[in-house]
Amino acid sequence: MQKIGIYPGTFDPVTNGHIDIIHRSSELFEKLIVAVAYSCAKNPMFSLKERLEMIQLATKGFKNVECVAFEGLLANLAKEYHCKVLVRGLRVVSDFEYELQMGYANKSLNHELETLYFMPTLQNAFISSSIVRSIIAHKGDASHLVPKEIHPFISKV
């Protein structure tokens, strides 16, 4: 059976930090599923279709990465793909507190599921989609924080 990991997120928008985690985690799995969450609770700046398209463009150079959109429980998506490992990024202590709870919740729904946490590289430690959205909303230039493939998306906002 193939070693498959899932890296879930809203990716609103995808950042250089996300791509760094995709790059590093894709080296650990035969296949990495990047799962773009519907997430109406977060009131996304970009539609699900746009977010999926952005992540597909930004990851087109990765041979073992597949991007999918999903709605519902991540634990169920993991079962569908026969995945036993979730990939998550941790920038700050508050991320850890949230991710620890989510990891336990996912494990309670799918007992085979483990969560693998990645720390960002130093140059990406401060980058978040929230910061990028804030810069964009205030008409600032966030192009240095996101992959070049998505510059057309952020310039339209």
From Swiss-Prot:
Q: Which UniProt keywords apply?
A: ATP-binding, Coenzyme A biosynthesis, Cytoplasm, Magnesium, Nucleotide-binding, Nucleotidyltransferase, Transferase
Q: Which GO terms describe its cellular component?
A: cytoplasm
State the Gene Ontology BP annotations: coenzyme A biosynthetic process
Q: Where in the cell is it found?
A: Cytoplasm
Q: Which cofactor does it need?
A: Mg(2+)
Reactions it catalyzes = (R)-4'-phosphopantetheine + ATP + H(+) = 3'-dephospho-CoA + diphosphate
The family database entries (Pfam families) matched by this protein are listed as: CTP_transf_like
Going by the record, the broad EC class of this enzyme is transferase
Q: Does the keyword Cytoplasm apply?
A: yes
This protein's record includes keyword Cytoplasm: yes
**CDD domains listed in its UniProt record:** PPAT
- Report the main location listed first in the record: cytoplasm
Report the EC code(s) recorded for this entry.
Answer: 2.7.7.3
Which biological pathway? Cofactor biosynthesis; coenzyme A biosynthesis; CoA from (R)-pantothenate: step 4/5
Positions bearing the site annotation: Transition state stabilizer? 18
Query: What does the annotation say about its assembly with partners?
Result: Homohexamer.
What's its job?
A: Reversibly transfers an adenylyl group from ATP to 4'-phosphopantetheine, yielding dephospho-CoA (dPCoA) and pyrophosphate.
Name of the protein in question? Phosphopantetheine adenylyltransferase
